[in-house]
């Protein structure tokens, strides 16, 4: 299949490709802004509703379980009905489920209700997980773009990080000035606006949905082809097997940082400080997106970046677990996030260069599913560790768990896939 160059080429971005990139960045900006309003205060929101640490992270695990359950079906929707349809369903589902979350907080609902709505939130996000990236890659190929995937994906990460920076800080400040529920209502409003924007701007190009009068048969066919391109493709399979350790830990750490930093700061009501954790991650996402294609040009293989990113970020997590100074914790948090984010666009480009267009959304959803499955197991376990031993210890445990991803990434490297070096079409 066609592969894009690892370097940057400004002349490769023709007018059609620039239009595709603008739409992609617009969708990324709106979606991330909507989501990030609550990222800095979500754990505090759940604890404020009366849940324990174990229940709060178990609710997050149900959200992740929803992603595991629906990743493949929604990927099939994207490949069978179109990436635009999938995106619109995602905004609608997330709007409704976020508002239900707000209502549960209002009435201090029992845990089972949080579990149910968390699964619905997971469903909403799975409509996005493979569809937007698949739409971008196919549209770029169709437009004749001959540059590096890392470049465009890195720009998307920079826009996402900027939106996350704005949204997470705003969410924390607004929560402190009003209450913890208002950021959730803001998320609903922005998601509804993004539904209108996507309806207007986003159209499937370079890809024809394979609809069928027999949806179950079509689902089996797409799923079978996706397994061939995914789990039965060794370099892709090993990347997928690394995901439960990297993504599963990443989900827990992101939300555990909120109460961890408040504990170090000494004021559990300083919601703006909790937003600061998300803001630091967002800033690292911006810088990481900018650095990724540049760092990629310094090494011969993409897996070099992935292995270094996974190993170094794991060691930093262990160090963070032994930190008792607030400002030192912020520095380690920033370095951890930056190292992790440099690897993200490189990993995305590596996978996309090994996947056939017809099953792209479903295989990418498979990859997301494996990461989410790790979160289902890791979050309750580490949440329980936080209850028993404290947040510091749980972060150190997180680093140890993440190190288990490195052998799988090395195994992918040993397959010598062409996408690992990808220097031309």
What are these regions (language model features)?
Residues 4-18, 203-241:
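Juxtamembrane intracellular "pre-TM" segments in multi-pass secondary transporters
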Residues 14-69, 235-278:
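Helix-loop boundary and gating motifs at the non-cytosolic
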Residues 29, 97, 110-128, 328-342:
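Hydrophobic core of transmembrane alpha-helices in multi-pass small-molecule transporters
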Residues 57-59, 69, 251, 260-425:
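C-terminal transmembrane bundle of multi-pass solute transporters/carriers
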Residues 88, 92-108, 311-324:
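C-terminal ends and interior cores of transmembrane alpha-helices
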Residues 118-161:
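Cytoplasmic helix-loop-helix junction between adjacent transmembrane helices
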Residues 181-200, 395-411:
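Symmetry-related core transmembrane helices of the 12-TM Major Facilitator Superfamily/SLC fold
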Residues 194-215, 410-422:
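Helix-loop junctions on the cytosolic side of multi-pass membrane transporters
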